[in-house]
Design a protein with these regions (language model features):
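N-terminal strand-loop-strand
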Residues: 1-22
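The catalytic Nudix box helix
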Residues: 22-55
Length: 133
Protein backbone atom coordinates (compact mmCIF):
# COMPACT_ATOMS: atom_id res chain seq x y z
CA UNK A 1 0.00 0.00 0.00
CA UNK A 2 2.38 2.64 -1.22
CA UNK A 3 5.34 1.81 1.03
CA UNK A 4 3.55 2.72 4.28
CA UNK A 5 2.56 0.70 7.34
CA UNK A 6 -1.18 0.46 8.06
CA UNK A 7 -3.24 -0.77 10.97
CA UNK A 8 -6.68 -2.34 10.99
CA UNK A 9 -9.11 -0.21 12.99
CA UNK A 10 -12.76 -0.57 13.89
CA UNK A 11 -15.59 1.84 14.49
CA UNK A 12 -17.49 0.24 17.40
CA UNK A 13 -21.26 -0.02 17.12
CA UNK A 14 -23.16 2.47 19.25
CA UNK A 15 -20.28 4.93 19.54
CA UNK A 16 -19.96 8.31 17.80
CA UNK A 17 -18.83 8.09 14.17
CA UNK A 18 -15.51 9.74 15.03
CA UNK A 19 -14.47 6.89 17.37
CA UNK A 20 -11.82 4.55 15.93
CA UNK A 21 -10.33 1.73 18.00
CA UNK A 22 -8.05 -1.27 17.71
CA UNK A 23 -9.66 -4.74 17.68
CA UNK A 24 -9.88 -6.29 21.14
CA UNK A 25 -12.09 -8.49 23.27
CA UNK A 26 -12.44 -10.90 26.15
CA UNK A 27 -10.21 -13.95 26.49
CA UNK A 28 -12.27 -17.11 25.95
CA UNK A 29 -11.80 -20.07 28.34
CA UNK A 30 -8.67 -22.04 27.42
CA UNK A 31 -7.38 -19.24 25.20
CA UNK A 32 -4.20 -17.21 25.67
CA UNK A 33 -4.24 -13.41 25.28
CA UNK A 34 -2.20 -13.81 22.08
CA UNK A 35 -4.78 -16.24 20.65
CA UNK A 36 -7.50 -13.78 21.63
CA UNK A 37 -5.75 -11.00 19.69
CA UNK A 38 -5.63 -13.09 16.50
CA UNK A 39 -9.26 -14.25 16.89
CA UNK A 40 -10.63 -10.78 17.69
CA UNK A 41 -8.76 -9.25 14.75
CA UNK A 42 -10.39 -11.82 12.45
CA UNK A 43 -13.87 -11.37 13.92
CA UNK A 44 -13.81 -7.58 14.04
CA UNK A 45 -11.98 -6.82 10.76
CA UNK A 46 -12.42 -9.85 8.50
CA UNK A 47 -8.64 -10.35 8.26
CA UNK A 48 -6.51 -13.39 8.99
CA UNK A 49 -3.26 -12.42 10.67
CA UNK A 50 -0.17 -14.03 12.13
CA UNK A 51 1.16 -13.17 15.57
CA UNK A 52 4.36 -11.12 15.43
CA UNK A 53 5.01 -10.01 19.02
CA UNK A 54 3.47 -8.42 22.09
CA UNK A 55 3.51 -4.61 22.17
CA UNK A 56 2.36 -4.17 25.76
CA UNK A 57 -0.58 -3.85 28.12
CA UNK A 58 -2.98 -1.01 28.84
CA UNK A 59 -4.48 -0.92 32.34
CA UNK A 60 -7.50 1.15 33.25
CA UNK A 61 -10.68 1.27 35.31
CA UNK A 62 -13.95 0.99 33.38
CA UNK A 63 -17.20 2.20 34.95
CA UNK A 64 -20.18 0.10 33.91
CA UNK A 65 -23.76 1.30 33.78
CA UNK A 66 -24.93 1.45 37.35
CA UNK A 67 -21.57 2.71 38.57
CA UNK A 68 -19.70 -0.57 39.09
CA UNK A 69 -15.97 -0.06 38.49
CA UNK A 70 -13.99 -2.84 36.82
CA UNK A 71 -10.19 -2.98 36.51
CA UNK A 72 -9.17 -4.05 33.00
CA UNK A 73 -5.92 -5.13 31.40
CA UNK A 74 -5.87 -5.10 27.59
CA UNK A 75 -2.92 -6.83 25.92
CA UNK A 76 -1.94 -5.57 22.46
CA UNK A 77 0.02 -7.54 19.88
CA UNK A 78 1.63 -6.69 16.60
CA UNK A 79 0.01 -8.91 13.96
CA UNK A 80 1.09 -9.43 10.37
CA UNK A 81 -1.60 -9.45 7.66
CA UNK A 82 -2.03 -12.85 6.02
CA UNK A 83 -5.22 -12.65 3.94
CA UNK A 84 -8.78 -11.39 3.79
CA UNK A 85 -10.66 -8.26 2.84
CA UNK A 86 -11.03 -5.70 5.56
CA UNK A 87 -14.62 -5.06 6.53
CA UNK A 88 -15.88 -8.56 5.62
CA UNK A 89 -16.96 -9.28 9.17
CA UNK A 90 -17.95 -12.53 10.81
CA UNK A 91 -21.73 -13.10 10.94
CA UNK A 92 -23.30 -11.27 13.86
CA UNK A 93 -20.36 -8.90 14.38
CA UNK A 94 -22.44 -5.84 13.45
CA UNK A 95 -23.51 -5.95 17.11
CA UNK A 96 -19.93 -4.94 18.04
CA UNK A 97 -18.43 -3.35 14.92
CA UNK A 98 -20.04 -0.87 12.55
CA UNK A 99 -17.05 -0.54 10.21
CA UNK A 100 -13.48 -1.79 9.80
CA UNK A 101 -10.83 -0.18 7.62
CA UNK A 102 -7.13 0.27 7.03
CA UNK A 103 -5.68 3.46 8.54
CA UNK A 104 -2.10 4.73 8.07
CA UNK A 105 0.08 3.90 11.07
CA UNK A 106 1.80 7.29 10.88
CA UNK A 107 -1.59 8.95 11.49
CA UNK A 108 -2.57 6.78 14.47
CA UNK A 109 -2.07 9.53 17.03
CA UNK A 110 -4.69 11.64 15.24
CA UNK A 111 -7.10 8.83 14.31
CA UNK A 112 -7.32 6.48 17.31
CA UNK A 113 -9.74 7.64 20.00
CA UNK A 114 -8.20 6.09 23.12
CA UNK A 115 -4.89 7.23 24.65
CA UNK A 116 -3.69 3.72 25.50
CA UNK A 117 -4.29 2.58 21.93
CA UNK A 118 -2.47 5.63 20.54
CA UNK A 119 0.47 4.66 22.76
CA UNK A 120 0.41 1.10 21.42
CA UNK A 121 0.35 2.41 17.83
CA UNK A 122 3.41 4.55 18.62
CA UNK A 123 5.14 1.48 20.06
CA UNK A 124 4.31 -0.40 16.87
CA UNK A 125 5.65 2.43 14.74
CA UNK A 126 8.89 2.59 16.74
CA UNK A 127 9.25 -1.19 16.45
CA UNK A 128 8.61 -1.15 12.70
CA UNK A 129 10.92 1.78 11.84
CA UNK A 130 13.58 0.46 9.53
CA UNK A 131 11.82 -2.88 9.05
CA UNK A 132 11.10 -4.02 5.49
CA UNK A 133 7.47 -3.83 4.41
Amino acid sequence: MGGRWFFAATRPTGRPKAVWALPKGLVDPGETPAETAVREAAEETGLTALLDEKLGDVRYVHTRRGGERVFKIVSFYLLRYRRGRIGELSPGMEIEVEEARWLPLDEASQLLSYAGERDMAERARAHLDGRAL
